[in-house]
């Protein structure tokens, strides 16, 4: 069985950095295989041959069962150390500007801001999260730019 998540051309404030990450979903991440609304984050290389983009890689299984990958850098902040993290609700939230990105179906659109008890919840980011190609074949989920 082969699943491919395609990436269309778009302009991003996140620079192009090398991306190469292979995850064995049978031996290393067995609970991630065939799951829904689960996330893995990689802020550091696992192996010497890995490349994790500009700010790290967020790998996500969508509500539709698809595999998706995003750069963890917030496109509004555009700095490698200001990251988004999954919140368990099909969203990723920027640690700094608090913009919420909808990752539930692999798009990464900004939808608002997490600001409890504050009136302004307008998203600061006007770009989607930078997406990477996620290809699943056999037991291996491959992430590439």
Give residue ranges: language-model regions:
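Sec-dependent bacterial lipoprotein signal peptides
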Residues: 1-6
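N-terminal pre-ligand scaffold of iron-sulfur
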Residues: 7-87, 102-106, 130-145
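Short, surface-exposed, charge-dense and proline/glycine-enriched linear segments
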Residues: 45-47, 116, 121
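Cysteine-rich micro-motifs
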Residues: 90-98
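Short metal-binding segments enriched for Cys and/or His
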Residues: 101-114, 121
């Amino acid at each position: 069985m082969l699943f491919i998540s395609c990436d269309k051309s778009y302009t991003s404030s996140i620079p192009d950095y090398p991306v190469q990450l292979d995850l064995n979903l049978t031996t290393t991440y067995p609970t991630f295989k065939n799951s829904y609304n689960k996330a893995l984050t990689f802020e550091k290389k696992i192996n010497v041959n890995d490349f994790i983009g500009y700010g790290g890689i967020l790998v996500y299984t969508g509500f539709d069962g698809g595999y998706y990958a995003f750069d963890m850098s917030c496109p509004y902040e555009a700095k490698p150390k200001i990251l988004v993290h999954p919140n368990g609700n099909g969203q990723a939230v920027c640690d700094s500007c608090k913009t919420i990105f909808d990752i539930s179906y692999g798009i990464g659109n900004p939808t608002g801001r997490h600001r409890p008890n504050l009136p302004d919840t307008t998203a600061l980011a006007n770009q989607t999260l930078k997406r990477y190609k996620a290809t699943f074949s056999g037991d291996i989920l491959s992430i590439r730019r």
